[in-house]
Amino acid sequence: MMTEPNGPALDALDGLSVGDALGAQFFVPETARSHFTGRTDPPGPWPWTDDTEMACSVYAAQRERGTIDTFDLTHAFALRHDFDRGYGPAANRMLRLIREGGDAKALAAELFDGQGSYGNGAAMRVAPLGAAYADDLDEVVRLAARTAVITHTHPQAVDGAIAVAVAAAIAVRARTGTMTPETFLGEVVFHTPIGAVRDGVIEAIALLAEPDPLVAAKVLGNGSRTSAADTVPYALRCAARHLTDYRAAVWEAIAPGGDMDTVAAITGGVVASCTGTRGIPAEWMAAREPLPGWAFPEPGGVTGGRGRADMLVPRSHPVPDVEWTDEQWQRLRAGRHTDTLDHRWAVHTHEGSVRICRPGGGHPVWEVAVTRIRGGRRPVSAVVETSHHRWSVLPTDPHGLTTLSWILRTAAAGERSALRP
């Protein structure tokens, strides 16, 4: 069950974004020389980077629906992609192609000669999700993995996202009691799949007593390779050592150089999950560039689909010539259409696809994949149930395409109209 959207999840987003924005200041050599040694604050404002932009999309998605719709989140990443926020070349290309109608799953899977990205991008954005589902660590693991593979399909990247999300969830739980750094990281190890990230967190436990961050980073990494395995263990070590001291944790995250904005974002998101926004220095919050307004949609403004069993015999179906404005798409997503459709059809969305069922049946007759276009959405593919054991439509039946087109137009318009055939 998701926590209050203005509670730990927002705390994690604030902590992540402040760490990201402060860390990014130290890529400027003059700032690094003049401010780091004395730990004095660089002059504001501090712009945030791609770390925060993507984390805002994660936060907005779960705030709006009360869960994560990976189709919508994928296209939110692409729609809000700002080239100047510091995305890597592979991410820039992939998000641009998704925005132009490319297959998101195929684009993510083909990165790095088909291995998928093993970078730290999935880990850097996930703390608000972990904080939101702190009551259910199994759900944290499941959702962290689902949101990771949108852009990062390599197991190391997925494991990095899981480790950070679990750490944020455990940090929320630590608000009501005390937790040693060893216990904190031990819980992360327990829930992280076997692999390089988990091994790194185990090494981080062994280095908790090491006072010199440069020594620890030499073993664990500092994000300079931009891989999850080179980033997550050190970031979580900083969080574990200073779980109730946001300032100390973030300064330690920045200390060894490397991918300073991302390491500080991960550390800051986890620590603020424990301390709350009140634990973040007020002057740092004031210096951080304000978060975008789109990150704060109306809570619960869109409800999820009802869920259903899969089709028995799906077949490709002609794609209706239909386009929806953004307003019409929101009406479709709200899922209240049976009265408009003469109580013969129920329409809802699930992970961005439109599903059309008989009321009370739950089994889809059609499922229509949708992509964003300028000013709205349009269908890009459709499948239909052809099993004789259920209400079925033959793909070659022209009446089927007519009916599907009528359903999609009428449900989006919200006004009853006659089905002529």
Where are these regions (language model features)?
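Negatively charged, low-complexity tracts enriched in Asp/Glu with abundant Ser/Thr
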Residues: 296-351
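Polybasic, proline/glycine-rich intrinsically disordered low-complexity segments
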Residues: 377-421
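Canonical SH2 domain fold
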Residues: 353-372
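Structured, active/binding-site neighborhoods that engage oxygen-rich ligands
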Residues: 1-299
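Hydrophobic residues embedded in beta-strands of well-ordered beta-sheets
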Residues: 352-354, 377-378
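A structural detector for beta-sheet-dominated domains
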Residues: 348-350, 371, 385
